[in-house]
């Protein structure tokens, strides 16, 4: 399945999608998204980290919402009950971040771009 309308409820997924050249798929972001700087003028904000506006998210008609861990479990549960697909990441270290990038590449069909981004990070570590 290919996802075309994505809401990102974490800053790192927003930034990663931009770095992967997949920002055209983003239809909504967390209010904490600041990188790249243009995200603040390009994408609507749908709430804070632990208090997203479910009605606003549903109105954007996403086919995927990206969340983080148990900290956003209540938000994820509400979205799932509304029939929206949710993927929750649980990255808490560098290895987890690299797995997140790899997973996003697989979910969005941009595995080569994800691999290149990971290789760039690994070269700097």
Name these PLM-found stretches.
Residues 1-125:
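N-terminal ligand-binding lobe of clamshell/alpha-beta domains
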């Amino acid at each position: 399945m290919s996802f075309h309308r994505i809401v990102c409820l974490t800053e790192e997924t927003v930034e990663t999608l931009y770095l992967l050249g997949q920002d055209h798929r983003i239809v909504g972001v967390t209010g904490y998204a600041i990188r790249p700087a243009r995200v603040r003028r390009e994408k609507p904000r749908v709430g804070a980290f632990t208090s997203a506006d479910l009605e606003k998210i549903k109105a954007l008609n996403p086919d995927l919402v990206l969340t983080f861990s148990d900290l956003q479990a209540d938000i994820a549960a509400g979205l799932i009950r509304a029939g929206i697909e949710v993927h929750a990441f649980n990255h808490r270290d560098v290895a987890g971040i690299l797995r997140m990038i790899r997973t996003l590449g697989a979910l969005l069909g941009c595995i080569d771009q994800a691999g290149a981004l990971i290789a760039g990070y690994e070269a700097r570590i």
